[in-house]
Amino acid sequence: MKTVTGFASATVGNVACGFDVLGFAITEPGDEVVLALHDERRSDCPVSITSIVGDGGALPLDPKKNTSSFVVLKFLEYIRTTKGISFDGHIDLVLKKNLPLSSGMGSSAASAAAALIAANELFGSPCTKMELVHFAIEGERVACGSAHADNAAPAMLGNFILIRSYNPLDLITIKPPKNLFGTLVHPHTELKTSFARSVLPKSIPLSTATQQWGNVGALIAGLLMEDYDLIGRALVDVVAEPKRAPLIPGFNEVKQAALDAGALGCSIAGSGPSVFAFSSSRQTAEAVGSAMQSAFLHSRAALQSDMWVSPICSQGARIISTTS
């Protein structure tokens, strides 16, 4: 029996001004998926979820409804029809959830990317990571009803990912500045993506759109030029953050605490409730994280939180172990 364990890390979608078109991966934490290959088919469905650890029983065990197993099923269909690789055996899947659910940290994308990189290894790596990204994006449709790439693409590919187009899919990889560190703080509360999207306006004034476009362009330029001051000036979201900030207890105080501690900028991670900040050194990033946690704790909701500091992940989804 061959087993493969895949890992994919947390991601931050939107990155302030890049609503639905920009995301990045951090090095930790992340989800793990263990796939075990068996020679004999045990049921009509070739994939079974044997266990999920760390979700508190919240995620479905139905392989067609869980994002990690769903993407493996799509992968198997793809390699059969396009690579000529047939499979008559069975795959057992174990999902180890190290990312909180409904957190704004790309939890479902990490599960999908980890499962896909493991499945690809299990069958001799017939697909490129760019091919696998398509399945990871479809996994997001199962998880939240929308096939978006701002978490799925960086979870698979690492780095910053700019989504120029969905049809056709056009992803642009942007390498991070070498001294850019991310701080990610997750308050102990949940915020459903569907609700966070429901508060957004259906249309915005042209002047607001112009301001947002300017910030997106400036952020990309700042990353490419390693201009940390420009990165900080560009981390301004005039579209989603003003509507979502009231949904996160203490957000304004947390953001101000991050800036006061030396962060280049700070905003909501994805749809929240997690909050991220950028700094130009690890020491500053850690001080920023402590200040953000303290602000959450001293907010009216008195929220406990978890905090991670890491450089931007350049590797993306990866294999962490194999056995034969």
From Swiss-Prot:
Keywords for this protein: Amino-acid biosynthesis, ATP-binding, Cytoplasm, Kinase, Nucleotide-binding, Threonine biosynthesis, Transferase
Q: List cellular component terms (GO).
A: cytoplasm
Write down a Pfam family by its short name: GHMP_kinases_N
Q: Where is the signal peptide?
A: none
**Top EC group:** transferase
Pathway of this protein? Amino-acid biosynthesis; L-threonine biosynthesis; L-threonine from L-aspartate: step 4/5
Q: Name the residues that bind ATP.
A: P100, L101, S102, S103, G104, M105, G106, S107, S108, A109, A110
GO terms assigned for molecular function = ATP binding; homoserine kinase activity
EC numbers for this chain: 2.7.1.39
Q: Which GO terms describe its biological process?
A: threonine biosynthetic process
Instruction: Please classify the protein's predominant subcellular localization into one broad category.
Output: cytoplasm
Q: What does this protein do?
A: Catalyzes the ATP-dependent phosphorylation of L-homoserine to L-homoserine phosphate.
PANTHER family named among the record's database cross-references = HOMOSERINE KINASE (PTHR20861:SF1), HOMOSERINE/4-DIPHOSPHOCYTIDYL-2-C-METHYL-D-ERYTHRITOL KINASE (PTHR20861)
What HAMAP family does UniProt report for this protein, alphabetically? Homoser_kinase
Q: What is this protein called?
A: Homoserine kinase
- Species annotation: Chlorobaculum tepidum (strain ATCC 49652 / DSM 12025 / NBRC 103806 / TLS)
Q: Encoded by which gene?
A: thrB
